[in-house]
């Protein structure tokens, strides 16, 4: 034990370390080199691990770009198609009327196509919020209650809720409506106006609502109603056609304004439409449309 059998003459490991034959590195050098190689290998492994770790960490995907909203090219107007002279059907079943012509002119100025969709007027707010129509443009009265859900343009016309009776009726004032049956369109501002005049409203025998004003006026003609409360523009249209059948009282249920109704978040269209209506008034086009339908300019 202790002798170096590989190289005779070098009896001990110490002698091998100190006196290694020529061409052989001393064990101390070999050991040192081996140690150095281990360090190099360790560093290399650490470096490789770091590189691989870096490669394995994928960069987070860039968030998908939010697509730009599609440009508006058309608006759909919701209306009651039995509301002359604002919007109704002629003998050819075509939609015509003052508000129809106003909407067409405004859309032309905005570079938009316009479509018209008859709706259940009592469900108009649901039609608008459900995006089945883009605007309510049909003698829509601006009220504080409606403002909670609808964005209105500036008023374009003043209106009154008038009282229409039979031409031979003994009813001459609101006070004469006590004990009478009064009709109005369901979901209309006529109903709201009546209820605001609490004393008169409570004096009625009954109030009946109808899907449209035409049906209410027919019931007035047959005697099932004693009076109908209706928008002035509509009431006077029918009275002018049948002055021997209907009459209008001097009393009415208040003054109100018409505006175009939009969704609350549709501020871009609101601004553009407001400007178009203002321009139409300024250049006289709106007045010409009014004169065509009412015989005079009744716009605000």
Predicted features along the sequence, with ranges:
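A ligand-binding cleft/hinge motif common to bilobed small-molecule-binding domains
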Residues: 140-148, 193-198, 221-222, 226-254
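Flexible hinge/capping segments at coil-to-helix
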Residues: 63-69, 165-182
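Short helices/loops that flank or line small-molecule/ion binding pockets
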Residues: 104-109, 117-118, 122-135, 149-151, ...
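Ligand-binding clefts/hinges and TM-proximal coupling segments of bilobed small-molecule sensing domains
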Residues: 57-63, 189-208, 247-249, 278-300
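C-terminal motif of bacterial Sec signal peptides marking the signal peptidase cleavage site
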Residues: 51-54
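Ligand-binding cleft/hinge of the Venus flytrap
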Residues: 89, 103-111, 190-209, 239-243
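Periplasmic-binding protein-like
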Residues: 81, 158-165, 236-278, 294-300
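Extracytoplasmic small-molecule ligand-binding "clamshell" domains
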Residues: 64-139
């Amino acid at each position: 034990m202790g002798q170096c059998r590989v190289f005779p003459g070098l009896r001990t490991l110490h002698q091998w370390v100190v006196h290694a034959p020529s061409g052989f590195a001393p064990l101390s050098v070999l050991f040192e080199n081996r140690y150095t190689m281990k360090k190099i290998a360790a560093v290399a492994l650490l470096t490789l691990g770091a590189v691989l770790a870096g490669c394995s960490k994928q960069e987070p995907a860039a968030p998908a770009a939010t697509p730009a909203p599609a440009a508006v090219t058309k608006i759909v107007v919701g209306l009651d198609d039995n509301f002359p002279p604002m919007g109704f059907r002629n003998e050819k079943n075509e939609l015509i009327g003052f508000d129809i012509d106003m909407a067409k002119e405004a859309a032309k100025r905005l570079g938009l196509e316009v479509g018209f969709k008859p709706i259940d007027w009592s469900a108009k707010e649901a039609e608008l919020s459900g995006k089945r129509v883009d605007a309510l443009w049909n003698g829509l009265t601006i009220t504080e209650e409606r403002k909670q859900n609808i964005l209105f343009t500036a008023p374009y016309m003043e209106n009154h809720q008038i009282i229409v009776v039979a031409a031979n009726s003994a009813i001459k004032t609101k006070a004469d409506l006590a004990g009478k049956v009064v009709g109005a369109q369901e979901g209309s501002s006529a109903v709201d106006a009546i209820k605001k005049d609490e004393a008169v409203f409570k004096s009625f025998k009954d109030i009946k609502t109808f899907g449209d004003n035409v049906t209410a006026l027919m019931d007035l003609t047959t005697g099932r109603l004693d009076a109908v409360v209706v928008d002035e523009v509509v009431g006077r249209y029918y009275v002018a056609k049948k002055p021997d059948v209907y009459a209008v009282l001097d009393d009415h249920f208040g003054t109100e304004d018409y505006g175009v109704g939009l969704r609350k978040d549709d501020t871009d269209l609101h601004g553009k439409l407001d400007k178009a209506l203002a321009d139409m008034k300024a250049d006289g086009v709106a007045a010409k449309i009014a004169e065509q339908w009412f015989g005079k300019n009744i716009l605000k």
